Design a protein with these regions (language model features):
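N-terminal secretory signal peptides that target proteins for export/translocation
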Residues: 1-17
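N-terminal signal peptide c-region/cleavage motif recognized by signal peptidases
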Residues: 34-36
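Subset of outer-membrane beta-barrel
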Residues: 41-439
Length: 439
């Protein structure tokens, strides 16, 4: 990761900060749960309490999810899918040849490039009142671990987001010159029934939040636990997938301060419905075939030797490399997010109604074995009274880099790749990058 950023000093600092946020996400989301007393209200508080709606409009996540315009619930897989659809934890990839599989992923995105970057879609124009934010920024990082045994999967994903906003005036009930830090941990289990054609998954969602108020050394923190579940239908040798994921709401309470009553923080429920279709000769839903199965068929031995297993794995690798590479994947998603409180994260009045966001994305390997491109778009409804919705355009790529097996640990897949993603809309620009293995 750091090597890929050499010569880009403007990226190094955000990267360090984002990695730090990811490391503490587990601590923020878990340790604060163990100290609920810190979130109790102060009996001497005088000001009226507020419920803060933590709904966020722009898409965050992996470079692939951003590049596809957030249309990801039906194609989520590998470590990128753990936080999106719990059922994706059981997806076995076509280049996974063993009964056991272990995956690790890391993504970083930075949304702070524009002089008037408007993360919260507050409408930063001179014609609007001075309570609008001068600038808002976002920094996102995620790390995920996935373990599979055949059609069973266990995944954990830790996401961290830091959103900062500044405004000229304050809104009663919440300080609006602040930074909001979110740590989210997803712990999912899933199984693929019918030989991996019907995948069901579920698990808890742990969220920790802290709010740094400008001009004050105090940091308000809280945490909560919710649940998430999902399914994925991927018939073998068919060109389509259908999926849905549900995340329950979470309510927590920020501690009171002298003269200020406790505030409730509401993390909304989310529902995502998705469908995907793939054109071209490349299979979207291949059957899981392991080296053990191939070795048993070719040798007739129920317990193949290590050498026979290695030979079978190389045979599967050669089949994978020789398969047709061109494809055009079309993915769509309808995301519905609850609106939950009168005050938004920016400190302005939020609209208490469901947020409906249609999304669409395209992906293709335009240069076989070397380059994948993706593009997409999604609709971001207005979350704050008096502002306008906006349409996002997204894009991304995976490019094959150099060959390095890390002293033989990564064979036979030993080429590295750079993945980039970008999301642009009115007064908004977010970029993401990651380093991984080319498949």
């Amino acid at each position: 990761m750091i090597a890929a950023c050499a010569g880009l000093p403007t990226i190094i600092a955000p990267l360090r900060s984002s990695l730090t946020l990811v490391v503490v996400a587990l601590f923020v989301a878990c340790c604060t749960i163990a100290t609920p007393a810190a979130a109790q209200s102060d009996s001497g508080a005088q000001a009226q309490s507020q419920t803060v709606d933590s709904t966020r409009g722009p898409v965050t996540g992996s470079t692939r999810r951003i590049g596809l315009g957030g249309a990801f619930v039906a194609v989520a897989e590998d470590t990128e899918g753990v936080a999106i659809n719990p059922a994706s934890t059981a997806v076995r990839l076509p280049y996974s040849f063993q009964d056991w599989n272990v995956g690790f992923g890391l993504d970083v995105s930075v949304g702070a490039w524009l002089p008037k970057n408007d993360v919260y879609n507050q409408g930063n124009s001179a014609s609007q009142d001075q309570t609008k934010a001068d600038k808002s920024t976002a920094l996102f990082g995620s790390v995920a671990l996935l373990v599979n045994y055949r059609h069973f999967g266990v995944g954990v994903s830790a996401e961290a987001t830091r959103n900062a906003a500044s405004r000229a005036n304050d809104t009663p009930g919440i300080d609006t010159h602040f930074a909001a830090n979110f740590g989210t941990v997803h712990l999912n289990m899933a199984y693929g029934f019918l030989d991996g054609q019907l995948l069901l998954g579920a698990g808890p969602r742990l969220i920790g939040m802290s709010f740094d108020r400008a001009g004050s050394s105090s940091v308000l923190g809280t945490a909560g636990v919710g649940y998430e579940a999902g399914f994925l239908v991927k018939p073998i040798r068919q060109r389509y997938r259908l999926a849905a994921a549900v995340k329950s709401p979470i309510d927590a309470q920020l501690a009171a301060q002298p003269g200020i009553a406790a505030s409730n923080v509401h993390v909304p429920w989310e529902v995502a419905l998705g469908a995907a279709y793939q054109f071209g000769p490349r299979a979207l839903n291949p059957r899981l075939v392991t080296a053990r199965e191939v070795a048993q068929q070719t040798t007739g031995h129920q317990d193949p030797t290590d050498a026979e297993l290695d030979h079978a794995a190389l045979e599967l690798f050669d089949r994978y490399e020789a398969r047709q590479r061109w494809y055009l994947l079309v993915s769509s998603e309808l995301s519905v997010i609850q609106g939950g409180g009168p005050v938004g994260l920016s400190g302005q009045m939020a609209m208490d109604r469901p947020v409906i966001s249609p999304r669409v994305g395209l992906e293709s390997e335009v240069i076989p074995h070397y380059l994948r491109l993706r593009g997409g778009s999604y609709y971001e409804p207005a979350l704050i009274a008096g502002t306008h919705s906006r349409t996002h355009g997204t894009g991304g790529l995976d490019v094959k880099l150099f060959k390095w097996s890390v002293f033989g640990l990564l064979k036979p897949f030993n080429y590295w790749q750079l993945s980039l993603g970008a999301d642009a809309a009115r007064s908004y620009l977010n970029t993401a990058f990651s380093i991984g293995i080319w498949h």
